[in-house]
Amino acid sequence: MRRILTFFLGSIIIGLSIIISPSSSFAYPFWAQQNYENPREATGKLVCANCHLAKMTTQVEVPQSVGADSVFKAAVKIPYKPGTEEIGADGSKVPLQVGAVVMLPDGFKLAPQDRWTEDIKEETKGVYFTQYSEEKDNIILVGPLPGDQNKEIVFPILSPDPAKDKNIHFGKYSINVGGNRGRGQVYPTGEKSNNSIFTSTAAGLISTIEPNKDGGTNITIQTESGEAIIEEIPVGPSLVVKEGQTIDIGIPLTSDPNVGGFGQLDTEIVLQSPARVIGLIAFFAGVALTQILLVLKKKQVEKVQAAEGI
């Protein structure tokens, strides 16, 4: 019942966002949540890349190792040129928005707010975190957020405690991260958004270029067989062809309006055992003590040799 209610409320929110703010609604991770049980495919690709075709760099910073039941930060960096604007769903210029996903190992999850430090509270101000599904609290989503203020998104993470969960073990784990800026080029239905380049589906002569009822443009191509092919271009992309021009199949009809992109990467973190840390400290202390004793022994031998005139 709870799952149905969540889906219903999510549908209402998304529906309203599409009506009220179509330029930003396409960035919501709702699409991935409803279409994919797991956001990471067998190939390792995050499903975000199925709609966000352009590639851009994403970076992440995590500690090399953490202790059990401790809070740490995963900082996802989504760089792009300041002031960059993209084409919204209505064809107008809008600021870029950003989003991120962090796929943690089983047992790791978003830290409860009562364990956030003051620094974390300050760094996450205005950021809303959601888990991918009720069953996957180790997958955390953020976005869309205004890009100019959120080029770095801090995720407060709680590490598991093997003493409380026998399925968790100390050792090295992989973390998968994805970061996006801007709208996608393809909708989950397979249709192109207006944030994409449009190409011709037929060869022939462009006979007419006319505005259509949706604010976009209809390009009519007369083929050699006499057939009239109408290419519907949505509002937003700029045309790069003109009437009377002869074109081939696959020729760009518009410029590429996209200025954003998606990037993903993997990193590693070690869930450190306290016993191992103590063992390492003891080992290094033993090595240091051995070195000191060797130096002292060497000096003692040198003194004896000097006294004996050797």
UniProtKB/Swiss-Prot annotation:
GO molecular function ontology, one term from the record: iron ion binding
Topology within the bilayer: Single-pass membrane protein
The gene for this chain is petA
Query: This protein is called what?
Result: Cytochrome f
Q: What is the annotated localization of this protein?
A: Cellular thylakoid membrane
Q: Which cofactor does it need?
A: heme
Q: Which UniProt keywords apply?
A: Electron transport, Heme, Iron, Membrane, Metal-binding, Photosynthesis, Signal, Thylakoid, Transmembrane, Transmembrane helix, Transport
Family matches, as Gene3D superfamilies: 2.40.50.100, Cytochrome f large domain, Single helix bin
Report the principal subcellular site: membrane
> Which Gene Ontology terms describe the biological processes this protein takes part in?
photosynthesis
Source organism of this protein record: Prochlorococcus marinus (strain SARG / CCMP1375 / SS120)
